[in-house]
């Protein structure tokens, strides 16, 4: 609903999210070790070309836009276990369900859900917290697992703006 009413139907929110995501996605990526810049590294190669579907800019635009719209961004890492992945994919936050653990603050798993069906389950290592899915979230004082979207915090103002626009359009259509 936030994506629809806040992002798709509100030009101000759409512009804000896109401006921030576009600017952040164009930040130059540099890698350093001990104060020395490293110019050739598999991680840099991966970030410059995350997958066949996404270039660097498109990948980071999606990551940042999802974070701003939902308060959560999920990145799927494809590759051999305990090694540098060879592909990265941003996952739609509305399709991710976090399975809370019975004890502790780490989730048990991340589930990828489409049309109400769990398509994939990505387990979380109980000792290290590592998973094929990397979860980036904004602070949420009321939820241990999901981030709080800036759009949610502004939802009343966004609703008011949308309703005012609908009212003004109705007046114009009725010749007022």
Regions picked out by a protein language model, each given a short descriptive name:
Residues 1-176:
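Structured, contiguous alpha/beta core segments that scaffold functional sites
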